[in-house]
């Protein structure tokens, strides 16, 4: 780390990003990081807000799929386990492909990839919710949701890093993560969904 006297990693590897300037190496005060690069960054706030809804779907499915499949759709516990596992395993190729699409096809424009993935998530959530006859369609929908939801989880964090200078990257990522975990998971996926289920 530079704090121990080492040079910046870009200089050490002679691998500078396109938008690099010596200015990015200057030390920033906590106030500058927080107010100039995080609190006043409207796009960062938009993606933090969007992250709450990404996490609503992620943890809504993660927390409620076993109960929904067993109690509403009539799965036995063994089939619930397989469906739930498939949802999680589908995340691995989905996240890798999402990153590749974002970098190679859309040239680093993270929002486009995220919007495509989330539109497809919405389609498969509706299919998963409305389908009452086909176990195969339930499983395909759950796998598709797992494949598609983890890409935006990853890309929102990456986009937060893209939107802030290197010295403010942790704070920017922390803001989006806070919105995801606190508002998306704790408030919406757990408290709000639990209240809806009970009433």
Task: Please name every model-derived segment.
Residues 5-46:
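Juxtamembrane intracellular "pre-TM" segments in multi-pass secondary transporters
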Residues 37, 41-98, 153, 157, ...:
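Extracytoplasmic gate region of multi-pass secondary transporters
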Residues 96-107, 197:
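Helix-to-loop junctions at the C-terminal end of transmembrane segments
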Residues 103-118:
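Cytoplasmic membrane-interface "Motif A"-like loop-to-helix N-cap segments
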Residues 119-133:
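C-terminal ends and interior cores of transmembrane alpha-helices
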Residues 136-144:
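Paired small-residue
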Residues 150-165:
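Intracellular juxtamembrane helix-capping segments at the cytosolic ends
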Residues 166-198:
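A late C-terminal transmembrane helix in Major Facilitator Superfamily
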